[in-house]
């Protein structure tokens, strides 16, 4: 009983976010667990690991196919960032709060995709603001860019920024951002391209909020790259090196050698992978790491032991042979 009362007391004492249109009396009533100093430290640390959060009922319901996480995985690989986790979650406040807090604490660089549109189910900004005890603030520069760059959609030819209408309120929701007044604006809001008004909103120093539209997601992440490169383990941005081998042998036949090889090269930071290709005549073996010179020296050995050859693209030497076992 006493434990439950204590838990209830802690819940009631929890601070809540405040919003631009509310009075200051509705602000934080207790010291936040998430401080500006913590966010500042996260925003400057070396980027070794990453996490990706795909937000959207439409993805979980099968209406939309998520391509952003696959693109982000390739993006991280090209920069030498170790992508540790991808999660797909619903447009649900509690899930967004829990996932963002957890990933922000666990990884150096986190992106979210989806849920920042004008409709009622676009709750990413509000949920992340709540997760980190921040207000939602109308960002004036983002609003100015929106007015200048956005084009009226079909059916909105008579839209006016000067009239207080439901359509105007819906548009404003897309530039009401989680915002910490104790941090520099440039550390919280980035415009990735001159022809885009959609901002990259950075929260708690490492949560980067992106739209779910693939072409915008990709363009904005590409525009962010120059800011990330100086913080990488390899500031030259060379990324990770991958060597592909095509083998006609079933996985069961090469498993012993690959196990021995993996143990031998682990201390060099090299991972050995084996991937069956169902319905194809050849399977794939990979070496992934940063020591290109050492990995290249292993090529003749691997080719010999898997009775295959190095390829540049998986499947480039496929034929019509039979299935291989997994």
Question: What are the language-model segments listed below?
Answer:
Residues 1-49, 306-326:
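Eukaryotic N-terminal low-complexity, Ser/Thr- and Lys/Arg-rich leader segments
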Residues 6-7, 67-131, 148-151, 325:
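N-terminal small/polar loop signature for handling phosphorylated ligands or for N-terminal nucleophile
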Residues 41-86, 91, 293-300:
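Glycine-rich phosphate/diphosphate-binding loop of Rossmann-like nucleotide-binding domains
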Residues 43-45, 103, 169-170, 174-177, ...:
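Solvent-exposed alpha-helices and their adjacent loops that cap or buttress functional pockets
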Residues 55-57, 112-120, 211, 288-290:
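Glycine-rich beta-strand-to-loop/alpha-helix junction loops that act as flexible
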Residues 123-232:
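Proline/glycine-rich low-complexity loops and linkers
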Residues 205-303:
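An accessory alpha-helical subdomain
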